[in-house]
Amino acid sequence: MIETKKKSAGWVWLIIGAALVLAALGAKPAWYAWLDLSFYWTERTEAELTVKAYAEEQGISIGEYPRSLIELLERNPETQDFVLNYPFREAAEVDLSGYESSDTVPLFLQWDPQWGYEKYGSDFLAITGCGPTCLAMAGYYLTGDENMTPGQIARFAEKNGYYESGYGSSWKLISEGAGKLGLTATELPLVKKKMVDALEAGKPIILAMGPGDFTTTGHYILLTGVEDGAFRVNDPNSVENSQRLWSYEEIEGQIRNIWAIEIG
């Protein structure tokens, strides 16, 4: 047992030494070299293996990927391209021209490269930005204002204290912040008819959701309409969830609060 520990320690020091040599040669930072050399010591998730393989193809270190983005890919495979492209991200002007439509609420994804790499609160907007993204979807649909983007709303939220550390976007972003943006957020009871009436009147509905189909913690989604008695949903974190109809019975027990949004 003691001998095994000594051998293990020997390998550790050998890898540390190799990492330092690579760093000294300018091949990569010591911490990145250490991450690459020690990667296969433990069992890895599919997301980690995907990122590692892509990093090797591109001649970069897996250390260039923030842990939170790898975990995002673990939770949501839809984000693969967004996560893999992180080291090659470039600042780009936001272009909403592809979303222009007077009769359809646009689906903004919080992990869209146009804004998803921006920081919002404690992490990337791609991870923490469901609230601003939902408010942006509703606001842009109702007003056509191209400043109603997830990035702009996220900055507005931080400036006005609507981001709560360790929690995310507070409900006040919707109930209070909407008014500062020229919108009105009316809280609704958990009654299907009230929700249907609001949607049929052209008012998108923001839902604060608890654990269930959309999240393991907390999340915001947007109801955009009614079809065959079920709700059309814009989930800012999932194209898949946004492509199907959701019955009231499916989501009822997951709803924590409800706001109908209209122009103020």
Model regions and ranges:
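N-terminal Lys/Arg-rich, disordered targeting/topogenic segments
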Residues: 1-10
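Conserved active-site-adjacent core of cysteine acyl-enzyme catalytic domains
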Residues: 2, 24-56, 95-96, 140, ...
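Compositionally biased, intrinsically disordered low-complexity segments
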Residues: 5, 18-19
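Active-site-adjacent structural segments surrounding the nucleophilic cysteine of cysteine proteases
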Residues: 12-13, 17, 24-162
